[in-house]
């Protein structure tokens, strides 16, 4: 029958912890007697080396004892693995597992012969278990233990220590590196170095001494039962060879189950492999502070990725790993201190990165003084090397203090915290650890972020208060820009209402009216016409002292001009020169007639005059009236003077004046000018 205890059939923790002292003393005495018997049997008959799955043979003369020890440990782990893992899961100590295992062995019906190790379903005798556990001592790699003669007293002491620690050692295999063979053996366990076996032996020795310091030595009534079972099994213990090959991967499952328990002790100093101190009493204070930081599930997954060879190979182990829940941390047991120091450094860096984002690193880390100015930045000061204990004291001490420190002190402590990742991130070892420990801090970020949020809030409030105290001084030094335009508006409104600021408003008005004036105008003429004079008066009356009373000048205006200005005459003569002689044939005659009559080259035809005058858009009757006034020769064409006077009359009509009934002589004289007769 297979003895597999599950959490449902496991006896309660109280019943297991009662016969603890009795079970340990029974294991001591039974193991010592069985070890003496096993030594006598090993001298007579040596077991042959067994084959290995890796096609390697064991050549060590201690191979028989080693195979027996490993087979017994494998069978013990296979049959009682459920109860041990379940005990750790429910928080039952390891001595309860030891007592429960011995109680189960006493209740079984012993058989006089040893079953083969492949058939783990039947009962086993107590002497076989004690002998095989005691024989595991022979796996030590030290040469002094190979060749030295063992006295009976040393045999009893070693057998008692191994009987107490082997059940614990089945669960407490600290890392996959401890599964390697001894230097004298040729068995390959998956590529691990053989020197790690010395660490396993060293850890077992330290575990034996700690268990021995508990002074749990008492007489037990179960000794006669164990001696009877030993007498019943009269045959010497033989170590079966093929069991090692099939059951070797079994302790690898226990490595994974044991890993979360190693996360408890924290040692700030990193050394290659230091021996644990005999009294680790002052360290559990820091361990209690850092307990919520350990997350068993991410560590287990991380260890599985880091050591791919630690995956179980047998089907029973795989089934147990799927069905069994992940164990919780039962108690703090300092073992493998370099691993924990490695883990604590990762915790420090990831905690600081989770609590303080990148924006906080960009902030100047100088302390905020009461003057509103930042002091020297702390980044230069934090570059000096500081221990990990200082970081734990600043982070965990905030939640432990009852009185709240003053705001500047808390600002300083908070600003030192984000600068910690800068000093640690410079080392290459911390950069390698940060990548593998990102998944550990997810459950602890909420606890730590509350403290950091409180500290950051106090820092922000203090900085805002300090800046608010000094803003009135800066405002008083610089004038406020808002009241200045309001005073200008008030002065402008008052000047418009009272009329006192006329000169100011008057000086600004001309650009507005000048913008509406036409720029394409003829230059100012010297004529005395009404419009030219009005144009002058319009610009003249806008002086610095204002306009005059009688702006229209009713009595001083002139009625009619009776002369053509020289400027107007030049403009009209240019138009005549460009259109003369058009559509007129030349005339032949005597010299006297040519002198008396105008030449056709100096005349402008009536059709051409009509076309030019019609561009003024005056009515045809008015244009006909002007034609009658200027056509003196009645020949159907106009000379130079006639054409100029006709153009002048049309312009006067366009300016608003009426066409006169006759043209005065002064107008004709202004047009003719000085004439020089042609030479004969």
UniProtKB/Swiss-Prot annotation:
May I have one GO cellular component term? cytoplasm
Residue ranges annotated as compositionally biased, kind Acidic residues, are: 193-204
Q: Which InterPro entries match?
A: EF-hand-dom_pair, EH_dom
User: Which Gene3D superfamilies does the UniProt entry name for this protein?
Assistant: EF-hand
EH domain location is 568-674
Keyword match Lipid metabolism:
yes
The record's annotation in SMART domains points to: EH
GO biological process entries = lipid metabolic process
Instruction: Spell out the protein name for this chain.
Output: Increased rDNA silencing protein 4
Q: Which organism is it from?
A: Pyricularia oryzae (strain 70-15 / ATCC MYA-4617 / FGSC 8958)
